[in-house]
């Protein structure tokens, strides 16, 4: 069976949305399952529903798995995404071939860091996205050099990218980027900005650049929420999907149908991003903190609240708990209490709480 690419996909008779050619508008540090099932899904919908007409270049932040870049490039950036779960009481198992990815580069391979810097000089580039794990946003003095190919840490790489852009456009204020951090730490955008400032100072970069980095660019803290199991582990299920699809897909991804992305940003940012017009579950808010509290206290809190009693009652998985009237009733009562206790606006309630 042939590997997925544009020609093979066309031969299967796939009739979903596909965008083959478009300028690269997004630089994404991270090529893992989560970003491809979450952020890249939103950009793909924005291409279809909002006419964004933009591609995403994936940059591997570490050198541990260079073959992933090879797999993605072999498939010309295409991969199959399955979103599964329950929505409005109905079972969902939706397939979509994601076509917003342009390619993937491992900057540790010969010549590939130059590709990253070339994109930094592009007029088309608008957005940087990152998910480099909780350990990715970190600064260690002396661990990365300005002329290193590439610098070691992710914040050092980003600082170098921003300096390349600053130099290419002679510090033009309108050439700054929107930087969306998805790492699972508090104030991820602010922490990333601090790290970049530390590297800029370590490297003795000029004050004019530091001013441009902090004022022309928008470092956004964000809250992400989607469960992403990733690859299908069952060989029989994988074989059945490949048979049904008519191709093999080494980058196939699976995520929960529920997903919400809350982006902390200034007035006007929502109009710069393509998501509002696309109608996807992405919000731009002045402060992400209350949204994070609601997520943790309602979604995570609900599970924590019933799991010990449910386990003692002989239940091992959440699905079975939700089929039990006693456990489900206890959880519903607890959710009502937390929903009423924490109010951060009607919109937030509707995104996370079933009681609105």
Label for each model-derived stretch:
Residues 1-349:
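Substrate/ligand-engaging "lid" and interaction regions
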């Amino acid at each position: 069976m042939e590997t997925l690419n544009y020609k093979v996909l066309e031969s299967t008779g796939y009739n979903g949305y596909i965008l083959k050619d478009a300028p690269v508008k997004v630089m994404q540090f991270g090529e893992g399952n989560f970003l491809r099932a979450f952020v890249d899904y939103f950009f793909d919908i924005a291409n279809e529903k909002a006419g964004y007409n933009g591609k995403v270049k994936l940059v591997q932040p570490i050198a541990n798995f260079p073959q992933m870049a090879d797999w993605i490039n072999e498939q010309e950036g295409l991969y199959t995404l399955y979103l599964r779960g329950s929505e409005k009481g109905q079972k969902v198992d939706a397939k979509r071939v994601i076509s917003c990815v342009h390619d993937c580069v491992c900057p540790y391979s010969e010549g590939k860091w130059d590709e990253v810097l070339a994109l930094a000089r592009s007029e088309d580039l608008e957005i940087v996205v990152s998910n480099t794990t909780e350990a990715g946003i970190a600064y260690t003095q002396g661990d990365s050099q300005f002329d290193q190919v590439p610098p070691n840490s992710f914040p050092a790489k980003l600082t170098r990218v921003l300096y390349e852009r600053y130099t290419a456009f002679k510090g033009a204020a309108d050439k700054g980027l929107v930087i969306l951090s998805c790492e699972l730490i508090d104030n991820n955008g602010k922490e990333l900005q601090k790290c970049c400032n530390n590297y800029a100072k370590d490297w003795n970069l000029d004050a004019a650049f530091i001013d441009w980095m902090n004022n022309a660019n928008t470092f956004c803290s964000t809250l992400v929420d989607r469960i992403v199991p990733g690859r299908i582990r069952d060989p029989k299920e994988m074989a059945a999907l490949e048979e049904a699809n008519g191709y093999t897909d080494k980058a196939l991804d699976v995520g929960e149908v529920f997903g919400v992305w809350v982006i902390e940003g200034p007035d006007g940012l929502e109009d710069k991003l393509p998501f509002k017009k696309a109608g996807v579950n992405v919000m731009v808010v002045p402060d992400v903190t209350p949204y994070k509290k609601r997520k943790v206290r309602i979604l995570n809190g609900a599970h924590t609240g019933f799991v010990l009693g449910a386990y003692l009652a002989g239940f091992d998985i959440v699905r079975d708990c939700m089929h039990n009237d006693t456990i489900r009733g206890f959880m519903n009562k607890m959710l009502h209490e937390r929903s009423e206790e924490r109010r951060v606006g009607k919109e937030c309630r509707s995104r996370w709480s079933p009681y609105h």
